[in-house]
C-alpha cells in the first residue's frame, strides 16, 4: 500500500543544483590503489565514528516519478539510525527509525508501519527502490559489500559499481566536505538503469 499523498513531495521545480549530473575529474593514470595505507587509514577513521548526522537535499528520478525532498540522517549507534524526509514547505513526509530487528516508519498522516527490513519497507511504501542497506555505508564514503570501486587522488571513494538482487548500481562521488575530519561526502549520485538518486549534504556533524 503506497504512502497516502507521499508524492506531494513532488512539489517542483526540482532544485537545479541537486539534479545537475555529477561531473568528476578522472585522475590521470591508474588511480590510487585500494591497497594503499592511506585508503586503509581513511576507512578506519570513518569506521571509528560512533555518532554522526547530516542534512541536505534528496532527489529521486525515474520514468514513473520525480521526487524532491529535504532529508535528515542521524546515526546514534551501530545499526541505530533515523531518517527524516520533509517536503519543500518543511512538513514531514516520512520518518523512519531503525534499530536491530525493528524498523518503524511514520507517514505524513501519522500512520505507523513496522517491519524488520528498512530497505524493503521504504520500497513497498514509496515505490522508490532505494538501496538503503548499502547506502548507509556509501553515504559515509565506504564501499560496504562492493568490491569494484575507484579512489580519487586523495585516497577517497570516487566511484562504486555494485550488483545485487537484479540491481546494478553505480555510485559517483562529486565532492567531499573537508571541514570535517575525516572528510565526508558532500555530493553523490546513484544510478541504476533509468532511475537516479541524488544526495547533496549541506553539512556533517561527526563524533
Swiss-Prot record:
One of its GO terms (biological process) is protein transport. A lipid is attached at residue 22 (N-palmitoyl cysteine). A lipid is attached at residue 22 (S-diacylglycerol cysteine). PROSITE patterns: PROKAR_LIPOPROTEIN. Residues 1-21 form the signal peptide. Keywords: Cell outer membrane, Chaperone, Lipoprotein, Membrane, Palmitate, Protein transport, Signal, Transport. Monomer. It comes from the Bacteria. The lineage of its organism: Bacteria, Pseudomonadati, Pseudomonadota, Gammaproteobacteria, Enterobacterales. Belongs to the LolB family. It is found in: Cell outer membrane. The keyword DNA damage does not apply. HAMAP family: LolB (MF_00233). It is a lipid-anchor. This is Outer-membrane lipoprotein LolB. The gene is lolB. NCBIfam families: lolB. Plays a critical role in the incorporation of lipoproteins in the outer membrane after they are released by the LolA protein. GO terms for cellular component: cell outer membrane. Pfam families: LolB. The keyword ATP-binding does not apply.
Amino acid at each position: 500500500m503506497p504512502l497516502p499523498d507521499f508524492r506531494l513531495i513532488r512539489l517542483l521545480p526540482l532544485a537545479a543544483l541537486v539534479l545537475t549530473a555529477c561531473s568528476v575529474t578522472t585522475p590521470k593514470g591508474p588511480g590510487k590503489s585500494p591497497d594503499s595505507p592511506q585508503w586503509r587509514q581513511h576507512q578506519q577513521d570513518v569506521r571509528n565514528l560512533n555518532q554522526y548526522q547530516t542534512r541536505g537535499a534528496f532527489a529521486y528520478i525515474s520514468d514513473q516519478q520525480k521526487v524532491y525532498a529535504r532529508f535528515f540522517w542521524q546515526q546514534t549507534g551501530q545499526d541505530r539510525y533515523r531518517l527524516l524526509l520533509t517536503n519543500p514547505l518543511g512538513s514531514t513526509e516520512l520518518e523512519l527509525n531503525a534499530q536491530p530487528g525493528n524498523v518503524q516508519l511514520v507517514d505524513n498522516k501519522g500512520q505507523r508501519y513496522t517491519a524488520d527490513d528498512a530497505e524493503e519497507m521504504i520500497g513497498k511504501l514509496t515505490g522508490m527502490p532505494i538501496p538503503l542497506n548499502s547506502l548507509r555505508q556509501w553515504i559515509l564514503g565506504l564501499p560496504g559489500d562492493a568490491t569494484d570501486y575507484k579512489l580519487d587522488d586523495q585516497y577517497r571513494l570516487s566511484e562504486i559499481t555494485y550488483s545485487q538482487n537484479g540491481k546494478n548500481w553505480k555510485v559517483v562521488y562529486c565532492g567531499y566536505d573537508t571541514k570535517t575530519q575525516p572528510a565526508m561526502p558532500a555530493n553523490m549520485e546513484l544510478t541504476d538503469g533509468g532511475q537516479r538518486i541524488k544526495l547533496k549534504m549541506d553539512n556533517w556533524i561527526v563524533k
